Amino acid sequence: MSPVQGTQASGTNALIPRLLLMVFGLSLFFGSAARADSWSAGAVVTYDQVEWGESTTAAGMLLNASYDTVYGPTGDEFVIGSTTPGYFALFTDEVNLDDFIPASGAPGPLDANLSNPSTSSAGVYAGQVAALKLNLDFSNAGLLPNSSGLLLGNLVLTGFSGSESSLNGMTVDQFFGLSQAELAGQSTTIGFPDIDNLGANINAAFDAGQPDSFAQDHLVAPGSSAAMPELPTLLLAAVGVLAAAMFRKKRTLGRPNPI
């Protein structure tokens, strides 16, 4: 018997580290691309329900000064929840809305249609939905100026796992629709208290223009590279398969041939 030449096996040994090094470099590149999308101060502006409900804050003064500008086209009506199906809360001016937020109590759905209420069965959750609506509506009206030029409703949710993984790829506008349905008493994929916590996190994500950790980890601009973190993982998996195939080939090449 004579052994087969080992040059091909040696070439395989040299190739695998080079492939792994290439994948490592690509991982660094895509990781840097994601980090390059991190938010800076003033990029987006939001306020939480406490700020919207306090007349002496920047948000409260903005609400009192511009309520008619934003909601005048709808007859000054501010509605949270849903008229069909489910329940809603209707406010007809900023004074009544200001009396309602910030809301308190255990989060839950509405259990009746309400007009200018000061409290509701939905507890703190109704206040979160109201604050998110204010953030979205005032952003759309150009009354929450920012340095990015982005509308809050167009930002994309990302980085969630487990029971919240269905949120990945959803815009803030789409999440608000989910929040409205939950408030009205409709069944959704999130449920309480998670949807209440998420609403609170979005409202506080860019508090007065200052991005927090939730904004950095879970909100990206539309089309952002940060919303595509799986590519390095896929590359590693592909190289793993290739390496295994080459290893099997190397073992075959190293076997002695019968004379």
Task: Name each model feature, range by range.
Residues 3, 13, 30, 243-246:
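Coiled-coil-like amphipathic alpha-helices with heptad-repeat character
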Residues 3-20, 231:
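Bacterial N-terminal signal peptides that target proteins for export
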Residues 18-29:
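Bacterial N-terminal signal peptides
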Residues 32-36:
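Sec/Tat signal peptide C-region and signal peptidase I cleavage site
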Residues 37-226:
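Soluble extracellular-acting proteins and domains
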Residues 229-247:
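A short, hydrophobic C-terminal helix/tail in secreted or cell-surface proteins
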Residues 244-259:
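C-terminal membrane-anchoring or membrane-association module
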